[in-house]
Each structure stands twice: as C-alpha cells, then as structure tokens.
Amino acid sequence: MKHPFLTLATIVALGTNLTAQQQQPYPLPLEEAMHILLTNNNAIKISRNTTEIAKAQKQQLNAAWYPTIAATGGYFHFSNDISAQANMGELAQDALANLESALPGLEQILQQLLPQLEQSLSALGNITLSVPLIQQNVTTLDAAALWPLFTGGKRIFAGKIGKELHTTALHLETLVTNAQMAAMLNAYYTLKLSNDVLTMQTGNLQYISKLLDDARRLKEEGFINKGEFLVVQVACDNAVRELENARHNKKVASRALSAILGIGQEITPCGNWFILDSLPCIHSIQQEILCNNAQLKILHSQDNILHNRENIARSNYLPDIALFARGNIYSHNVPKNLLPRSTVGAAMQWTLFDGLAREKEIKKTRLEQEQVDYTISQTESDLTTAATALHSALEDAACNIQTLERTMDLARELLRERERGFAEGFCTSTEVIEARTALTKANTALNLAHWQYCTTLANLLALGSNTEKFIELHNEYRQ
C-alpha cells in the first residue's frame, strides 16, 4: 500500500504480455489474409453464385433455337356416344342423282324395272340411319414438335441479352471482390495501426513508470520538489489511460478484421508499412479508372441490354413462323378416318394490333437508356473527382511521412539530451516528460500517416478494380 499507483501501472503495463500469452494471436501475413478473404467472405461467395446463375440463364435463352418436343394425351368421357345421323330417303335421292349424272337415262330404266320405286323412296324417308363414330370413352396419346423458323430476330437479341447479363454478373463479382479487398485492407492496416500504438503506449508507460521511480527517489533525497513529482505522476496516469484506449481500439479493429475474413481467431497482422517511390500523374490514373472501373462496365452492359430490349420490341411488328408436327402414339376409340394419326405443317402468327403496347415498350426502353446514359456521365464525373481526392491524399500522406521521419529523429535527439540533463541535474522531470510526449506524438502521427497512405492507396486501386495489385506493391516497396 506504500505505492498503490505504481502497482497499478505495473499491472497495466504487463497486461498486454499476459493477454498475448493466454490468447496467442495468429500472425497473419497480408497474402494469407487476402487468400482467406477470397475463400471465406460471404459477399464474394454470393457474387460468384450470381455469376453462375447468369451463366445458366444465358444457356437457357439459347434453348429458343431448338425445337420443342412434348407428349400430350388424355382420357375423355363424353355424356353420350358421338354418331352421324341421316335420312334414308335423302340418301337414296342423292345416290340416284349421282347415278343419273354418271349414267343418263338410268332413272327411266329403274322406273320401268321397278314401278314402285317412288313409293319405296318415300317409305325410306321415314327411316333415319345412325352411324356410330366415337364411343363415350376415348383415350389418346400424341407426340408434338414445334420449331420456330422466324421470330423477327427475337432469339438473336435475347441471346445478346443473355451474354450481357453474364458479363454484368462478372463485372459485379469484380466490383464486390475489389470492395471487399479494400475493406479488408482498411481493417488489416487499422489493426496494424492499433497494434503499433498499443506497443508504443506500453513502452511509454514502462518508460514513465521508471521515470516515476526515479522522481520518487529524487524527491525523497530532496533534489526535486513535490510539484515536479506530481507532474510525473500525472503523466503516468495519462499513460495508463492511453494504454487502455489503445487496448480497446485493438479489440474493435480485431473484431472488424475477423468479421470480414470470417474467422474467429485473434489475429496479429504481419504486413509492413510501405510507400511508393513516385506516383503516376493524376491524368493517367483517371484514364485507367475510367477504363477499368467495374461499376462503369456494369452501366455500359445495362445500356446494351436496353438496346437489345428495344430491338425485341421492334421485332414484335414482324410475324412469327414455325414448323409443327404431331404423331399419334396410342389411341383408343378414335377412328383414323376421323382423326389422322400424323400431321405436319407450318403456322404463322402476326399481331396486327395490340393496343399500342409495342410503341409504349419502345418509348419506355428509350427513356431507360437515357437514364442509364445520364448515370454513366455522372459516375464518370464522380470517379474523376474521387481519383483526384485520393491522389491528393496520397501525396499529402507521403509528404507527412517524410516530414514526420525527420521530426522523429529530432524528438529522439531531444529526449536523449533531456535524459542526460535530468541525470546530471540540469533538467527537470517536466522537461523529460515533455520530450517523451513529443516523441510519442510524433511516432503516433507517423504511424497514422503510414496508415493513411496504405488505406488511401487501397481505395484508389479499388476504384480501378485493381486491388490485387496492392499485394505486388507491398512486396516490392515494404519497409
């Protein structure tokens, strides 16, 4: 109980090492993190599945070029048998008329041979002849084929739409993958920044704790007053608070990275800070982004889809022509003389008026194309502005890194001079604390500048759908 604050500071300083020994965080290189992301990330899995769906849809549209073959059949029960009825007298009169036309004079010969012919024909007029055609229960099974020959170009344009849908899905997969890569890199370097800050704050607390011991000893020996001792004690209290904040920030950053990667183990990033020797000019970066950006490619694919939809709407003005064939496989109680066993032919369907639906569809498609064109123009403008802002942020971060590296050298030299002066009695503990604080702030600012540079570079590469290049640059320029 003699020095309770010192005991608390020591426990807090050692807490990081104890926690690390218990949890044993997994050292994760940047390349492995990227591989885990591509394997485990659900958003990327969904985009890949969407691509497969679009591919299947494209193949489904190609089926319109082939004939459709189907089997149709049924069992029918009628309320009564179907039969043909006719008057015998009328049939006889018709038969005699046909014979008379074929053999002139036949009627006179028959009247001589059969004097009662007229009476017989009159008697037949009272008799009705009934011929059964189809019985009450009927069963039939047919095979039918339909092969469209001409559709006005609908199949051609539908095939183009299928290809564009597949292309759109591929661009969407690229967009999602690059967005998730950029998010992972931001989370990865945020965790690295948190680790570096935690290590720095741990060392800072250990340093100030040692300085507090020296200040207590000098106070007891009468070399410094109570005010100077309290300055060191307040600095130690602030160091404890900063260390706790650093630990909390590390936990938050670790959870964010684990969520993106889809793993539950605690991670220690092994990637390095790096900075490029030089940046390409902003014009070349903007052109590359406008050529490769996945969002722009998706919009262009949508424009092509709408153009083909308009062509399909125009093709509705033309007739549809198809070949058809039907063959009976099995039939029961269906005579051949009433229903032929096979049929082949060609059919045409031509819509002459549909309530102006075709005209409205063409107008709607044109308006949608205009909307997509406006969106493309606005997206290009937004991408150009974003590229300019990110390029400027990269230049600022690079300039800050160079300046802060010189500031770090000066802060280290200042701290060494203050420590030497404090040991010889020429400097107070307050001056040593100020020098240490300046070094800590410079180190924090340098790490923050490195974080800003790396994350900004990742976001800039993501605009051009080329985030995987970040790994190459990291391996080439890492410090």
Regions found by a protein language model. Give the residues of each.
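Transmembrane beta-barrel architecture of outer-membrane proteins
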Residues: 138-140, 186, 231, 320, ...
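Periplasmic alpha-helical coiled-coil/stalk elements that build and connect Gram-negative outer-membrane
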Residues: 28, 56-58, 171-290, 393, ...
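Acidic, low-complexity, intrinsically disordered peripheral segments
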Residues: 7, 21-23, 70, 77-98, ...
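Hydrophobic, lipid-facing positions within transmembrane beta-strands of outer-membrane proteins
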Residues: 139-145, 285, 342-348
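Amphipathic alpha-helical coiled-coil segments
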Residues: 34, 46-61, 176, 180-199, ...
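Bacterial Sec-dependent N-terminal signal peptides
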Residues: 1-30
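Small/polar (Gly/Ser/Thr/Ala-rich) solvent-exposed segments
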Residues: 45, 68-83, 126-136, 146-175, ...
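Amphipathic alpha-helical coiled-coil scaffold segments and their short linker/junction regions
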Residues: 34-40, 89-126, 263-326, 467-479
